[in-house]
Amino acid sequence: MATQTNESFPLEKTRNIGIMAHIDAGKTTLTERILFYTGRLHRMGEVHEGAATMDFMEQEKERGITITSAATTCYWDDHRVNIIDTPGHVDFTVEVERSLRVLDGAIALFCAVGGVEPQSETVWRQAEKYDVPRIGFVNKMDRTGADFENVLEMMEDRLSANPVPVQYPIGAGDMFRGVIDLIEGKAIIYDDESQGMQWDVREIPDDLESKAEHWRINLLESVAEYDDELLMKYLDEDQEVEPEELHTVIRKATLNRDMTPMFCGSALKNTGVQRVLDGVTNYLPSPNDVPAITGHHPQDKEEDITRHPREDEPFSAVAFKITTDPYVGKLTFVRVYSGTLESGSRVYSPTRDEDERIGRMMFMHADSREDVDVIRAGDIAAVVGPKNLKTGDTICDPDHPVVLESMDFPEPVIRIAVEPRTKADRDKLTNGLTKLAEEDPTFNVRTDEETGQTIIAGMGELHLEIIIDRLKQEFKVEANVGQPQVAYREALTDMIDEHYVLKKQSGGRGQFAEVYMDVGPIPEEEEEESGLVFENEIKGGVIPKEFIPSVERGIESAMEDGPLAGYPIEGVWVRLYDGDHHEVDSDQNAFEIAGRLGFREAARHANPVLMEPVMEVEVVTPDDYMGDIIGDLNGRRGQIGQMGQRNDAQVINAEVPLSEMFGYSTDLRSLSQGRAIYTMQFGSYEPVPEEVASEIMDEQTMSATA
């Protein structure tokens, strides 16, 4: 394919969005429909083409269009829309997290029957963390039990959201026929035969006039809070509030995250999708509408550097996804925050402290790639060339280095041993695991030094099942898989003042390093940190500054092997406050050893405890089985939390150690005759009770000596 010149597309007409949803809310169907409608509009310039459209839909049903790339570019109403894929399953919340990090706005998708489900809450919290403005779409209005108003109430109760309908459904379930546009004051009835390409605009049906009036007043009152002029018009009965005025103020309130405009429809039945696209262009932000991104200088974390979404600023971008493409090899998806980048350029990776060369650059469409020669501020593109970039890394202009805010990924909580079935599979297994680990920052691979086994770790059983499946499908590797094991951690609970001297003299040059340090758990005010918080308070050069990083490196290596059972130590605070060195016998190696051995000594005396991953579990069950299920969760060391009702079912929330949840799917099926369902996601690491901890440590000792 010939390389296209990427003409500068107006930033104010660019939208970088994601679709956030629970696993069965209909995200794939909505995405397919968006790609279908925007694809026809972009290529043909005309949407209303009955026969061609229906042919395309037939193929679509056969092929099942899905977004396999991390980002897809499409066009709607003179706007360019980049859709960043966000998965729905809880084991993949990290995928959602990294998507939200680089998008500007989102469509929050809800099932009209299920409403706000556990994953909806998780994704909503992540969107709040990254200040992402949202519009909402209540999907599946054609399903039995669909209830638009119930979804709004659940959003208020469970998400503390402010949903403001700009539409109201005409009917529900089998009777769903269209929507009332509360801004225009008209009914929109969709034509089933035209695959949603044609609709009639009518007067509001008599039986819905009072409902429409109620929700229009709700819309006007909600919006009037954000604009004095509009408020005066609303209060003055002689003045009509124009649709354009409403759009302007709704946009302002949405960008400030004060409200979530709500749409409704059925993606499967092709109703309401174009209106959601209008909502994307009308209400969601362009790159110009979001604050400039702030990073820091690679050599000085205290020096803030700001990058605005302008082409005349130095180039900066974040790599948010790495994939392997069968045709072009390693693809790195980047979000450009400032400046421009031409193919063939060299960029600097401050996190790796090395240069990378950019080869090809391309925009990904639903079913094709578009090679371009330049990418600009606001663009989302895939690049070929970088060898060592990882997810979350910054790339920038070598003459203007900056580290943009990096992504924090949770540590894996479950691990299994894998081994190739044949010698021929060994290299393929190593190669496959390396590539998969490059793509997914929550998937770890390591070799157990004592047993020689390859250990893979991830966020849940499903996560690792999919990894094993991908090894088979993509890399043609057959692997034997061990039993899942919990990824325990260790933590320090007491503060220790450690003085350690390394002094070795064995003829010729010796080794000398002396350190004084406080070692203990991270203080409460810094609890968001999870690894090592290292504070350097050395004064007067008693330890030369070039040796300080060596002490930190030594501590980090010692943290990988805890004093209780050899599990990694989490949440450590160290203050290096004094020490000494020798002009000849001190070097970086000596201080690294002193840091490692000094920390190891301190950790033994800091009252270490074993920590286990505790999962947030939600079970939805008919009344009849509630007692048995609660009893079973208690038997798994579960702490029962909030209980309530959702539609006709009971909802039980509990916190349960991961070690007690293996095989729960089968047990729950037996307890409830297959009628209860559950979801589970990582909550936090908590201390293991003493009697359980001693069993785990005994097992670990036995396996180490076996």
From Swiss-Prot:
Start and end residues of each stretch annotated as Disordered: 288-309
Primary location: cytoplasm
Keywords of this entry: Cytoplasm, Elongation factor, GTP-binding, Nucleotide-binding, Protein biosynthesis
A GO molecular-function annotation: GTPase activity
Binding-site positions, GTP: 21-28, 85-89, 139-142
Signal peptide: none
UniProt feature coiled coil, ranges: none
Superkingdom as given in the UniProt entry: Bacteria
GO biological process annotation, one example: ribosome disassembly
Residue ranges occupied by any tr-type G domain in the UniProt entry: 12-288
Localization per record: Cytoplasm
Compositionally biased residues, Basic and acidic residues: 297-309
Tagged with keyword Protein biosynthesis: yes
Entry-linked Pfam families: EF-G_D2 (PF22042), EFG_C (PF00679), EFG_III (PF14492), EFG_IV (PF03764), GTP_EFTU (PF00009)
Cellular component terms per the entry's GO annotation: cytoplasm
Function: Catalyzes the GTP-dependent ribosomal translocation step during translation elongation. During this step, the ribosome changes from the pre-translocational (PRE) to the post-translocational (POST) state as the newly formed A-site-bound peptidyl-tRNA and P-site-bound deacylated tRNA move to the P and E sites, respectively. Catalyzes the coordinated movement of the two tRNA molecules, the mRNA and conformational changes in the ribosome.
Family affiliation: Belongs to the TRAFAC class translation factor GTPase superfamily. Classic translation factor GTPase family. EF-G/EF-2 subfamily.
Full protein name: Elongation factor G
Organism for this UniProt entry: Salinibacter ruber (strain DSM 13855 / M31)
Gene name, Swiss-Prot/TrEMBL: fusA
